[in-house]
Amino acid sequence: MEMRGIENKSDIALAEFRLTGINGPDKDSSGSTYPDAAAVEAKYEAERQIQLRAHETVSDIEITVDDGWTDLAQDPWAGCPDPAGETPHLLTQRSHLLSQHRHRVLIVGAGFGGLLFAVRLLQTGQFKASDIVIADTAAGFGGTWYWNRYPGLMCDTESYIYMPLLEETGYMPRDKYASGSEIRQHAERIARYWGLETRAMFRTSVRDLAWDEDKKIWNVAGRLLGDVMDTEQFRMAADIVLLASGSFASPRVPNYPDIAKYKGKLFHTARWDYQFTGGSLENPKLTGLADKRVGIIGTGASAVQIIPHLARYSRSLIVFQRTPAAVDARDNRPTDPVWWKEEMASQGAGWQQRRQKNFNAFTCNETPLPGNNCVGDGWTRMPSFSLLIGGPQNLAPDYIDQMRAVDLVRQAQIRERAHALVQDPVAADLLTPWYPGWCKRPCFHDDYLSALNEENVRLVDLRHGGLSHFTPSGVVANGEEYELDLIVLSTGYTVPVTRASPGSRGNISITGRNGMTMEAKWANGLATLHGVMTRDLPNLFFAGTSQAGACVNLTYSVDQNATHVAYILGKAFERRPPNCDKVVLQPTHEGEEQWAGEVLARAAAFRGIAGCTPGYLNGYGKSLDSLSPEQQVNMARLAAWGEGIASYVNRLEEWREKGELEGVEMTFLN
């Protein structure tokens, strides 16, 4: 492996930073390793300062087909027939659903969030599949798993708890950690099982939602998409709208200087082009890269899975890294059918939710912990991640110090692993993470670090000089030009920290009663009821983390939102008087302010994020110091439920057990 981009050895703050105990943890009398805490903390801060200086301040490109961004914006899978070869039928189905104009329920998003909303509504008995229409810009079900089909794609959360509705569908995942194609196929399975496959309007972009106070409906406007570009506008109406755009709906593309001048192949990881690289998700032999000079920008969770394949097949690979990933072992293995039958299916009804709750207990560091760690993976051995997602101990005065001590040992082990697997010691230094483990989503992979030993791979450190601009033939980083035939943008997504509201995450303009917009509600002191509905946006429900529960297993938290929304709607329709066909729901002012106050009182649970290196979890290093006290309070109102997902779910269940719909304002109309 040839190392490049580390010429700036004069920057002794990091390149030559050596303190006792930080590169090889000492051992105590019992043989356990422990690092020199003060030395490590000093290096963490030195690295953070370098990262803050190195972080790009360029804006993000909104990838549309306008201005020549066709390759970045288009759906590469839209022209591919589904397993039944029915892609043309999908457009006919869309036309049929649009011809009905008005629908009882519109769900925006056809990923697991949208599907769970639909399934939980159906289970109330108050809704039929024919009442529901699902809109998505994709040409199929799956959400982020529809778009992401890059080589090596897998889920980092155990499939037995991540893939929803396994118990209901009777499906056994093939492996402990499922591939992207298996997960996408499971989304299609759910749609078929509940009769939702004919209720989807694919290649449909909802752009505008406006509440009609006279008719008590949502007017919906947007565009119908073809294989490549926008084709025509549409309008429809819905009594109820559920937003399920997800946290990773919009690829993030930094607007690097002169990026439009690049003449080679350029695509984002969420828009992988197998026609150029060769291979497929199911058979990722990238034979088209045998004579290609490839560069990949970014070394986050997607890149960690992609880089081993690029290293194996490309003529040369340049890995542009600013912040190294913290990579632990994955240890994937096939599902043993005998074990599955004995340990899972034989446990009776509710086995999946019990396993999910067990996983949550360990990742949120509940006390006391369950006696049995069912999942038993890297996530459940990382209690410090509770500082990011919340937990029952987070508000204790000394909790951060406790978690820092635990995390120092874990991160030291992660760094030891990098040095053990990467042959070049200079490369190993660059690939070791010097930040608290909860500051960035940890990665789990068995081939990533060893792939960087390949002779055709170069690692370019962007912390000092950075990636300054594109050229027609490549990029310039640290003052050196790298000529590349293909550049892969592994630059992530716009996420809730930078696009806080559910509407903004889906690029939807939402206007409710009295001109109230969703963006204004989120910017000026958010108040919701349980994180799923807000006043002046009636009959609008959403999933997310603001004022709701957060956890590592995203499908579990979304399912809790969906279950709660379905309960509210189901009970409201049960209570409607005879001959009333419409119900209008919104929180009372007192109800949502009380809930917001409880969220605010727990917001300090996330104080451990302060001081993290820049990344999507903290708005790419955006400081709160420049905000006024009022603005800081408004930001705190956007927090998740600080006591952890179990506490949040318990509060919702207690509320539902009362059966009073407390805090919900209901209007019944003929």
Curated annotation (Swiss-Prot):
PANTHER family: FAD-BINDING MONOOXYGENASE AUSB-RELATED, L-ORNITHINE N(5)-MONOOXYGENASE-RELATED. It catalyses: preaustinoid A + AH2 + O2 = preaustinoid A1 + A + H2O. Pathway: Secondary metabolite biosynthesis; terpenoid biosynthesis. The lineage of its organism: Eukaryota, Fungi, Dikarya, Ascomycota, Pezizomycotina. Belongs to the FAD-binding monooxygenase family. GO terms for biological process: terpenoid biosynthetic process. Its cofactor is FAD. One of its GO terms (molecular function) is monooxygenase activity. Transmembrane segments: none annotated. InterPro entries: FAD-binding_Monooxygenases, FAD/NAD-bd_sf, FAD/NAD-binding_dom. NADP(+) binds at M154, C155, D156, T299, G300, A301, S302, A303, V304, Q305, R322, T323. Pfam families: Pyr_redox_2. FAD binds at T144, W145, Y146, W147, D156, T157, Y162. Its EC number is 1.14.13.-. It comes from the Eukaryota. The record marks R441 as: Transition state stabilizer. In A.calidoustus, the austinoid gene cluster lies on a contiguous DNA region, while clusters from E.nidulans and P.brasilianum are split in their respective genomes. Genetic rearrangements provoked variability among the clusters and E.nidulans produces the least number of austionoid derivatives with the end products austinol and dehydroaustinol, while P.brasilianum can produce until acetoxydehydroaustin, and A.calidoustus produces the highest number of identified derivatives. Keywords: FAD, Flavoprotein, Monooxygenase, NADP, Oxidoreductase. FAD-binding monooxygenase; part of the gene cluster that mediates the biosynthesis of calidodehydroaustin, a fungal meroterpenoid. The first step of the pathway is the synthesis of 3,5-dimethylorsellinic acid by the polyketide synthase ausA. 3,5-dimethylorsellinic acid is then prenylated by the polyprenyl transferase ausN. Further epoxidation by the FAD-dependent monooxygenase ausM and cyclization by the probable terpene cyclase ausL lead to the formation of protoaustinoid A. SUPFAM superfamilies: FAD/NAD(P)-binding domain. Binds 1 FAD per subunit. This is FAD-binding monooxygenase ausC.
